[in-house]
Amino acid sequence: MIGYLQGSLAGVRKQSGRLLLLLDVQGVGYEVQTPARSLVELPAAGQSLQVFTHLQVREDQWLLFGFLQMAERDLFRQLISVSGIGPQLGLALLDSLSLAELVQAIVAGNTRLLSRTPGVGAKTAERLALELRSKLAEWREEAGLLPSATAAPIAAVQEDVEMTLLALGYNNREILQALTAIAQENLVQSGQPAEDWIREAIAWLSR
């Protein structure tokens, strides 16, 4: 098993919507697929780069997947352990939400949020939550991904908040960022009604 690769970034290209890195490790070029969002964090060509890797062995080919953080690689492995979640869908999930947001959605059983990822239907989202909820609740403590105690409105309120903000034109990432920020700033408490969360979220997003 290849745990990580460290070398110089020889090139980056996109193929069929996939982000592929060419990593030069002591004269050997490794092609590594990585989450698309990693593009903004990559160094310039020729600069040093370390990626934590997952090797998938098929009958016809070996595929390397690379991640800039070990926690991201470990979460990817958890995702693809679920029936119906292949590597490409695992990467799509990692691209749709931040690490902490994705783990929180699974632990909280927020299947509505999970199913917004292209390719993830309601049944797949339910399977993710069912199979990984307890595992990730424990794992995120070790990985340091614990949310704050007031990181989101209670489940009964969250759907109303999200639907209202989506209708106003905000996207999923903006909504999650706003809800997390106003909770961390103690502008709203978990048990307050949807109207309070919506008002503060709009104010935060308008800054």
From Swiss-Prot:
Protein family according to the UniProt entry: Belongs to the RuvA family.
Location of region: Flexible linker: 148-158
Organism in which the protein naturally occurs: Synechococcus elongatus (strain ATCC 33912 / PCC 7942 / FACHB-805)
Region feature (Domain II): 69-147
Stretches the record annotates as Domain III: 158-207
Domain of life: Bacteria
Name under which the protein is recorded: Holliday junction branch migration complex subunit RuvA
Annotated segments matching region Domain I: 1-68
